[in-house]
């Protein structure tokens, strides 16, 4: 909307994103930070002297918690080398490594790399969405199998949407084929994705 700006500046560390009590603590910390951010904008940013908070997210966003171990684990090298996996289910992915500090504010020393250079777009393999030891389950979004650094790349919304589309089609295909998700005919999933314009 004209006159409104989305600000994404709150940050909390040393919180277990799987513990509801600690998440509640993080909510309080972030809400206190919002007041400080508004004051900062009013004092130091021209044009924001009379700014005020219009709305905030209902819940704190958790960037990273535990990682599943999948049949395939995505690595930073897969991303930089623009790997096209034979069992791809999400394509045309490109983003930098956006590693936030786990000990304080800002980015990790390896954070948002301004000199990031990948050879091109990479794909998400179906194997990263299939847990190594759990049957009847598919992973989608930021919880797929990948290293900490790779996760900082594929956890963003655009890539997660593509993963969700591929995994959703795979789940429906597993039901139609009457098989466990790990035994899905990935070529059939890819045919359905290609039918709606998703290509490697």
Please report, for each region that a protein language model flagged, where it lies by residue.
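Flavin (FAD/FMN)-binding glycine-rich loop and adjacent Rossmann-like elements that form
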Residues: 1-200
């Amino acid at each position: 909307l004209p006159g409104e700006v989305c600000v994404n500046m709150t940050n909390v560390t040393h919180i277990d994103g799987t513990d509801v009590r600690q998440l509640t603590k993080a909510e309080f910390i972030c809400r206190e930070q919002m007041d400080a951010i508004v004051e900062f904008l009013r004092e130091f940013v021209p044009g924001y002297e009379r700014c005020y908070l219009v709305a905030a997210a209902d819940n704190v966003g958790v960037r990273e918690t535990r990682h599943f171990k999948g049949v395939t684990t995505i690595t930073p090298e897969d991303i930089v080398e623009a790997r096209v996996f034979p069992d791809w289910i999400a394509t045309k992915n490109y983003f930098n490594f956006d590693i936030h500090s786990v000990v304080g504010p800002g980015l990790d020393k390896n954070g948002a790399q301004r000199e990031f250079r990948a050879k091109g777009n990479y794909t998400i393999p179906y194997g990263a969405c299939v847990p190594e030891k759990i049957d009847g389950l598919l992973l989608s979004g930021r919880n797929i199998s990948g290293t900490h650094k790779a996760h900082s790349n594929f956890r963003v919304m655009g890539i997660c949407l593509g993963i969700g589309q591929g995994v959703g089609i795979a789940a429906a295909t597993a039901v139609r084929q009457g098989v466990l998700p790990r035994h899905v005919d990935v070529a059939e999933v890819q045919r359905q994705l290609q039918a709606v314009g998703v290509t490697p």
